[in-house]
Amino acid sequence: LRSTKVAVKTLGSVAASDLIAVLESLQIQVADEGDLTVVLTDDYLNPKLDKFNQQALKSQSPWMLVKPLGTIAWIGPLFNPQKTGCWDCLAQRLRDNRPIEGFIHRQKHVSSPLTPPLGFLPSTVQTALGMAATEVFKWIIQGENQQLENNLIAYDAIALQTQNHTWVKRPQCSSCGEMVNGLTKNPLPVVLEHRQKTFTADGGHRFCSPQETLRKYQHHISPITGVVRELSKIPGNGLTHNYIAKHHFFSIFDDAASLRQNLGGRSAGKGRTDSQAMASGLCEAIERYSGVFQGDEIREKGSYQKMGDKAIHPNVCMNFSQQQYHNREQWNGECQGWFQKVPEPFDEEREIDWTPIWSLTHQEFKYLPTAYCYYGYRPDYKLDCWADSNGCAAGNTIEEAILQGFMELVERDAVALWWYNSLQKPQVDLDSFDEPYFQSLKQYYQTINRELWVLDITSDLNIPVFAAVSRRSDRSVEDIVLGYGAHFDAKIAISRALTEVNQILPNVLFAKADGSTNYPPLCDRLAVDWWKTATLSDRPYLVPSDRVAAKVRGDYREMASDDLLADVKLCQQIVEKNGLEMLVLDQTRADIGLRVAKVIVPGMRHMWKRLAPGRLYEVPVKMGWLQEPLTQEQLNSFPMWM
C-alpha cells in the first residue's frame, strides 16, 4: 500500500475528490501520476478516452474505468496493456450495442456520444465509488485483479444486483491487436481436417453437443460487451423450442425499417430440445455478426475486366434476369422487403473492392465483390450487388460450418426449382420413419384445426430436401405456413422442415374478436399477403402429387459418414459432378472463435425471385418433371417470401 500510487482522472461531470477521499480512507496513496490510473466518466464512449487509451498503450500503463452515475453504475474493466485488450476493443462492442445512437449518428453525421442526463442519488454514487476503491485495493494487495481484467461489472442500484459482463481482447483491434491491417495481408487457403462427429441427434451433424457449444460461447451474450445483446425464449407449444437473438447488424438499406428489425431481433434458433434451440439462436446471431463488414477484411482493388479469370461475375451468383434488371425501378418501388429488390446492373469497368474466396474445386483463390460478401459494405456508387445469408453458417469447426452452409444452398436451390416451376411433388409417409416426434406434431396440429404434411422436393443433386406445409382447415383464409430442410440424413432434413414450420406458426395462431387472424405488427407484408390469399385450390404445387407413391423411409439411403471432412468431400463431389464449382469464404472473427463460413456455388439458385437462365429452367426438363422449360412469364409470380 505504501509503495503503490494511484492517480484519479475525470472526464465528464464526476468530481475526482469523492473517489480520492474513499481511496485515502483505505490508506491508498493518491498522486498525480500513479502505478494505476482510475478514470471517472459519465460515458464510456467519451471521445477523450481514445487519446488516454493511446497514451496508456504507449507507456504500457494499467488503468481502470468507472461510471458511478445513473441507476446502473459501471465498474471496470481494468486495462492492462501486457495482458488484456484496450479501451478500443471495448468501445467497438459498446458502439455495436447502441443501435439507435449509431443510427442517429449516421443520419445526422455526428460522432459525439448522445449521453442522456443520468439520474442518481449521492448515496448510489458513494456506493459505486466504494466498490471501485475496493477493487483498486484488491489490485494493490494481490498484484492483479482478474475479475476486473476480464469483466465490466454493472451495479444496479434499484434492483440491488451486480452483473459481470465478459469482455475480450480483439486480436484485430487497430490500437492493440497483433493482427496486421487487413488491406496488407495475404489471404489464407481454407485447410480442412478430419473431424469426428460426436452429436447427430437433432438439427444436424456436429463436432460437439449443443451444451458444449453454449458453454464455450455464451460469454458473448451481453447487452453491454457482447456480440449478442439478448437471447430470449419465445413461448411455444413445447414441441419445438424457439429463441430470438438481438445483435449488431448493418444492412446497406440503413433506414428506420432496418433499425426496427435490428431492435426486434435479426436471428432465431429452433430445435427439438431447449439447448439445441438456444445454441442454434446463438450460432445464427454470431454467424450474422461475423458477416458484417468491419473494414479490416482482406480486399483487392480492380475492375471485373482487369481482374481476369480469377473474378466471378456477381450475377452468376445472384441470378437476376435481364427482364428483372430492365423493370427494376418499377419493381423496387412496389416490392416489399429488401430481399426482393433488384440492384443496378453490374458495371464491369468500375474499379471496386474484391474479396478473395477459396475454391475447393480448383484449390486457388477466386474473387467476388466485397459488397456481395459482407453485410453493410457501402460503396460510393449505386448498389449493383449486396450480401445475403444464403450459404452462411456457423459451426464448432470450419468443416461443420461448411457442411451446414452447403446444405442451406441445396435447400434453397431445391425450393426455387419447385416453387417457381409450380411442380407437384410426392408426399412423405411420416409414419414410416417411426419417429414419435413426428406423430406428436401431427396430433398437436389437429387440435388447432390445422393439417400438416411433408413434400419431397429433392433436386438433381440427390440430397434429401423437404417442404413441410400446414394450413388451417376450419375457415376460408388458410394461413398456409411452410418450412424447409435439407440433409444427408432424410430424418434430420424432415425434422428441420417441421421445426421451421413450428417456428413460423405463432405468426398465424392468434385471432381478433371477429375471428380473423391477428398477424404481428412487424410481420413482413409479403408474408401476410401470402397467408391471407394463398389456398390449396389456387396453389396445386402445395398438394402432394397423386401420380407417384408416397416416399417412405426405405427410399432414402444413408449418405453421411462419421467424419465431417468426408461429408464435405461428398458435397464437393456432388457439386463437381453437376459441372459446378464449390467455393468458401471464411468469415470467422478472431475475437469470437466460432467458425463461420459462406459457401458459394455459382449457378445454384436462391429461393428468392431471381429469374436468370440456368438451373431454374434446365433442371425440371433434365429430371423429366417438365417436357420443356417454362418461360419467365410462365413462372410462379408470387415470390418466395421467407
Residue ranges of each PLM-predicted region?
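Helix-biased "structured C-terminal domain" signature
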Residues: 161-642
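A glycine-biased structural micro-motif
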Residues: 3, 147-153
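Hydrophobic beta-strand scaffold residues
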Residues: 30, 60-65, 452, 582
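Conserved beta-strand termini and adjacent loop/short-helix elements that scaffold enzyme active sites
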Residues: 31-33, 66, 89, 455-457, ...
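Short glycine/serine- and small hydrophobic-enriched flexible loop segments
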Residues: 131-139, 283
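E1/E1-like adenylate-forming module used to activate ubiquitin-like modifiers
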Residues: 7, 11-13, 19-26, 34-128, ...
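N-terminal charged helix/coil linker that caps or initiates catalytic domains
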Residues: 1-7
